[in-house]
Regions:
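Thiol-/selenol-based redox modules, centered on thioredoxin-like
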Residues: 61-130, 143, 153, 157-158
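Alpha-helical linker/edge segments of TPR/alpha-solenoid repeat scaffolds
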Residues: 94-95, 151-177
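Alpha-solenoid helical repeat scaffolds
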Residues: 113, 146-149, 164
Length: 177
Protein backbone atom coordinates (compact mmCIF):
# COMPACT_ATOMS: atom_id res chain seq x y z
CA UNK A 1 0.00 0.00 0.00
CA UNK A 2 2.74 2.42 1.00
CA UNK A 3 4.78 1.71 -2.12
CA UNK A 4 1.79 2.47 -4.32
CA UNK A 5 0.47 5.60 -2.58
CA UNK A 6 3.48 7.19 -0.85
CA UNK A 7 3.49 10.14 -3.27
CA UNK A 8 -0.14 11.01 -2.46
CA UNK A 9 -0.14 10.41 1.28
CA UNK A 10 2.25 10.39 4.23
CA UNK A 11 2.01 7.30 6.42
CA UNK A 12 3.20 6.88 9.98
CA UNK A 13 2.45 4.11 12.41
CA UNK A 14 2.24 4.44 16.16
CA UNK A 15 3.11 1.46 18.33
CA UNK A 16 1.57 1.57 21.78
CA UNK A 17 3.86 -0.50 23.96
CA UNK A 18 4.67 0.35 27.57
CA UNK A 19 7.96 -1.58 27.30
CA UNK A 20 9.16 0.71 24.54
CA UNK A 21 11.62 0.50 21.71
CA UNK A 22 13.19 -2.84 22.62
CA UNK A 23 9.86 -4.62 22.09
CA UNK A 24 8.73 -2.65 19.04
CA UNK A 25 11.88 -2.62 16.91
CA UNK A 26 11.98 -6.36 16.13
CA UNK A 27 8.54 -6.07 14.49
CA UNK A 28 9.48 -2.95 12.57
CA UNK A 29 12.65 -4.64 11.33
CA UNK A 30 10.83 -7.87 10.47
CA UNK A 31 8.21 -6.00 8.44
CA UNK A 32 10.87 -3.83 6.80
CA UNK A 33 8.65 -0.76 7.13
CA UNK A 34 9.50 2.14 4.85
CA UNK A 35 7.59 4.74 6.84
CA UNK A 36 8.23 6.08 10.33
CA UNK A 37 6.90 4.40 13.46
CA UNK A 38 6.44 6.42 16.63
CA UNK A 39 6.47 4.62 19.97
CA UNK A 40 3.83 5.67 22.49
CA UNK A 41 4.83 4.30 25.90
CA UNK A 42 2.26 6.41 27.74
CA UNK A 43 -0.88 5.68 25.68
CA UNK A 44 -1.17 9.36 24.82
CA UNK A 45 -2.62 8.37 21.46
CA UNK A 46 -5.40 6.36 23.12
CA UNK A 47 -6.32 9.31 25.30
CA UNK A 48 -6.12 11.82 22.46
CA UNK A 49 -8.21 9.85 19.97
CA UNK A 50 -10.42 8.01 22.46
CA UNK A 51 -9.63 4.33 22.01
CA UNK A 52 -8.99 1.40 24.34
CA UNK A 53 -7.85 -1.23 21.86
CA UNK A 54 -5.69 -1.52 18.77
CA UNK A 55 -5.22 -1.61 15.81
CA UNK A 56 -6.79 1.64 14.64
CA UNK A 57 -6.61 3.80 11.55
CA UNK A 58 -6.84 7.58 11.58
CA UNK A 59 -6.57 9.64 8.40
CA UNK A 60 -5.76 13.33 8.66
CA UNK A 61 -5.99 15.54 5.59
CA UNK A 62 -3.49 18.22 4.57
CA UNK A 63 -5.44 20.81 6.60
CA UNK A 64 -5.08 18.73 9.77
CA UNK A 65 -8.72 17.63 9.77
CA UNK A 66 -9.47 14.05 10.76
CA UNK A 67 -11.55 12.64 7.94
CA UNK A 68 -11.42 8.93 8.76
CA UNK A 69 -11.23 7.14 12.07
CA UNK A 70 -11.63 3.38 12.41
CA UNK A 71 -11.32 2.24 16.00
CA UNK A 72 -10.45 -1.42 16.39
CA UNK A 73 -9.82 -4.05 13.75
CA UNK A 74 -8.11 -1.67 11.35
CA UNK A 75 -6.08 -3.76 8.92
CA UNK A 76 -4.88 -2.37 5.62
CA UNK A 77 -4.85 -5.94 4.27
CA UNK A 78 -8.65 -6.01 4.63
CA UNK A 79 -10.08 -5.43 1.15
CA UNK A 80 -12.93 -3.17 2.29
CA UNK A 81 -10.64 -0.97 4.36
CA UNK A 82 -8.12 -0.75 1.53
CA UNK A 83 -10.87 0.34 -0.89
CA UNK A 84 -12.08 3.04 1.53
CA UNK A 85 -8.56 4.39 1.90
CA UNK A 86 -7.91 4.37 -1.84
CA UNK A 87 -11.14 6.33 -2.35
CA UNK A 88 -10.08 8.76 0.37
CA UNK A 89 -6.65 9.25 -1.21
CA UNK A 90 -7.80 9.54 -4.81
CA UNK A 91 -11.06 11.46 -4.30
CA UNK A 92 -10.43 13.35 -1.02
CA UNK A 93 -13.56 11.87 0.53
CA UNK A 94 -14.52 12.18 4.17
CA UNK A 95 -15.12 8.58 5.10
CA UNK A 96 -16.32 8.60 8.67
CA UNK A 97 -17.16 11.19 11.28
CA UNK A 98 -14.56 11.81 13.96
CA UNK A 99 -17.20 11.31 16.64
CA UNK A 100 -18.58 8.08 15.22
CA UNK A 101 -16.67 5.76 17.52
CA UNK A 102 -15.20 7.86 20.29
CA UNK A 103 -15.06 5.87 23.51
CA UNK A 104 -15.57 7.19 27.03
CA UNK A 105 -12.22 7.08 28.81
CA UNK A 106 -12.44 6.85 32.58
CA UNK A 107 -10.29 9.46 34.30
CA UNK A 108 -9.62 7.39 37.45
CA UNK A 109 -8.42 4.49 35.32
CA UNK A 110 -6.15 6.80 33.32
CA UNK A 111 -4.65 8.23 36.53
CA UNK A 112 -3.95 4.73 37.88
CA UNK A 113 -2.40 3.79 34.55
CA UNK A 114 -0.09 6.83 34.67
CA UNK A 115 0.92 6.09 38.25
CA UNK A 116 1.71 2.52 37.24
CA UNK A 117 3.78 3.77 34.33
CA UNK A 118 5.88 5.83 36.75
CA UNK A 119 6.62 2.67 38.74
CA UNK A 120 7.34 0.74 35.54
CA UNK A 121 9.83 3.40 34.42
CA UNK A 122 11.48 3.09 37.87
CA UNK A 123 11.82 -0.66 37.26
CA UNK A 124 9.22 -1.55 39.91
CA UNK A 125 7.30 -3.85 37.57
CA UNK A 126 5.31 -5.58 40.29
CA UNK A 127 3.86 -2.34 41.65
CA UNK A 128 3.24 -1.02 38.13
CA UNK A 129 1.19 -4.10 37.29
CA UNK A 130 -0.78 -3.74 40.54
CA UNK A 131 -1.78 -0.20 39.54
CA UNK A 132 -2.62 -1.27 36.00
CA UNK A 133 -4.82 -4.09 37.29
CA UNK A 134 -6.65 -1.57 39.48
CA UNK A 135 -7.10 0.53 36.35
CA UNK A 136 -8.64 -2.48 34.58
CA UNK A 137 -11.04 -2.98 37.51
CA UNK A 138 -12.38 0.52 36.83
CA UNK A 139 -12.24 0.23 33.04
CA UNK A 140 -12.43 -3.46 32.07
CA UNK A 141 -12.84 -2.59 28.39
CA UNK A 142 -9.39 -1.00 28.18
CA UNK A 143 -7.61 -3.66 26.17
CA UNK A 144 -4.50 -1.57 25.66
CA UNK A 145 -3.66 -1.69 29.36
CA UNK A 146 -4.89 -5.26 29.76
CA UNK A 147 -2.76 -6.55 26.89
CA UNK A 148 0.32 -4.67 28.09
CA UNK A 149 0.01 -6.46 31.44
CA UNK A 150 -0.26 -9.76 29.60
CA UNK A 151 2.75 -8.91 27.42
CA UNK A 152 4.90 -8.16 30.47
CA UNK A 153 3.76 -11.28 32.34
CA UNK A 154 3.79 -13.57 29.26
CA UNK A 155 6.27 -12.14 26.72
CA UNK A 156 6.43 -15.42 24.81
CA UNK A 157 2.80 -14.89 23.75
CA UNK A 158 3.60 -11.49 22.20
CA UNK A 159 7.24 -11.09 21.28
CA UNK A 160 8.44 -14.37 19.81
CA UNK A 161 6.92 -14.17 16.35
CA UNK A 162 3.19 -14.47 15.81
CA UNK A 163 0.95 -12.97 18.48
CA UNK A 164 -1.13 -15.73 20.08
CA UNK A 165 -4.69 -14.40 19.76
CA UNK A 166 -6.24 -17.73 20.78
CA UNK A 167 -4.35 -17.54 24.07
CA UNK A 168 -5.55 -13.94 24.53
CA UNK A 169 -9.17 -14.93 23.96
CA UNK A 170 -8.87 -17.81 26.45
CA UNK A 171 -7.21 -15.50 28.99
CA UNK A 172 -9.93 -12.90 28.55
CA UNK A 173 -12.63 -15.49 29.29
CA UNK A 174 -10.85 -16.57 32.49
CA UNK A 175 -9.95 -13.15 33.87
CA UNK A 176 -12.08 -11.26 36.29
CA UNK A 177 -10.38 -8.05 37.34
Amino acid sequence: FYDKYNKEVQIISIAIDFQGKSKVMPYINKLNLKFPTLIDKENITGELFGFKAVPNGIMIDEKGIISYKKIGKFDIRNEDIEKELINWITKSLYLESIDAKTINLKEDAINLFKKGLTYYDSNNIKLAIEYWKKSIEIDPDNYIIRKQIWAIENPEKFYTGTIDYNWQNDKLKKEKY
